[in-house]
Amino acid sequence: MSISNPSAASEHLVSVSAPAKINLHLEVLGLRSDGFHELAMVMQSIELADQLHFRNTADGSISLRCDDSSLSTAGDNLIVRAAHLLRERSGFSDLGAAIELQKRIPIGAGLAGGSSDGAATLVGLNGLWNLNFSQGQLEGFAAELGSDMPFCLAGGSQLCFGRGERLESLQAMKASMAVVLVKDPSVSVSTPWAYGRCKELFSSRYLSKESDFEQRRQQLRESSWLNPLRADDPPPLRNDLQEVVAPEVSAVQTTLKLLTDLPGSLAVSMSGSGPSCFALFADVASAQAALQLQQPAFAAAGLSSWCCAFRCEGIKLEA
């Protein structure tokens, strides 16, 4: 890795798109020695994204502004944390940035919006500050900041193991696949609560041996997600947190019921720890038609909805 002189850092505006993700498979295998859950997941980027803009500051300050006043822009925000971490690792303490966030991914939705914003910050400032950190180094920084962040950085279709930070790239899903995504804007779910509740309810069925973990990983590697539409059967969506969250969050129950009624959907599931849920479609046209038909029912229930195509790549600097 070669870090350029910060005096050569870019003076122009750098923009980065930070896409949301959905969980096509989320399996809680057991507990790790560090207290986190061991997971086996399939994660997929979708075309619903926040937009971040970065400019250098002459005084070395790092600041964040957002068009959503409900989002904290203080030091606990992953964008700010990522900026400080990258500056620390660069060795140039006088680097600064003014960051603007256009928030489009709903907050607390199980879509990794915060993680994606943090990952986008690593990419954006790596370019703005002319640091030349490699993709592998950025993924290492991302793993320090959050379990979902390495996936958000890499994007596309990935098997995710460990806490979610260990990635194995899948053959890209069919580019035409899409989802109808639905969320109650008045409801959010705490990820730590969801995993804590999962432990309370289902720890008796947790696996404990690494050999058992690896057996489940291998089964997922060999699953039909490698070719999701090669058969007429619906793709095998799974989310172990759904059976934790849905019984206690009525909005998730309502959302899943309305999504199940969509014509042409292949399968329905909750994403992450919720409360966002989605219906999977073979192509964007089918998803758009189904959403148009059901949108009045979603609106009547107070639900926000989107049609999102699958995204085949991760976070990149925009021209």
UniProtKB/Swiss-Prot annotation:
Its EC number is 2.7.1.148. GO terms for molecular function: 4-(cytidine 5'-diphospho)-2-C-methyl-D-erythritol kinase activity; ATP binding. Keywords: ATP-binding, Isoprene biosynthesis, Kinase, Nucleotide-binding, Transferase. The keyword Kinase applies. The active site is at residues 21, 148. HAMAP family: IspE. GO terms for biological process: isopentenyl diphosphate biosynthetic process, methylerythritol 4-phosphate pathway; terpenoid biosynthetic process. Transmembrane segments: none annotated. Belongs to the GHMP kinase family. IspE subfamily. It is an enzyme of class 2 (transferase). The lineage of its organism: Bacteria, Bacillati, Cyanobacteriota, Cyanophyceae, Synechococcales. This is 4-diphosphocytidyl-2-C-methyl-D-erythritol kinase. Pathway: Isoprenoid biosynthesis; isopentenyl diphosphate biosynthesis via DXP pathway; isopentenyl diphosphate from 1-deoxy-D-xylulose 5-phosphate: step 3/6. NCBIfam families: ispE. The gene is ispE. ATP binds at residues 106-116. It catalyses: 4-CDP-2-C-methyl-D-erythritol + ATP = 4-CDP-2-C-methyl-D-erythritol 2-phosphate + ADP + H(+). Catalyzes the phosphorylation of the position 2 hydroxy group of 4-diphosphocytidyl-2C-methyl-D-erythritol.
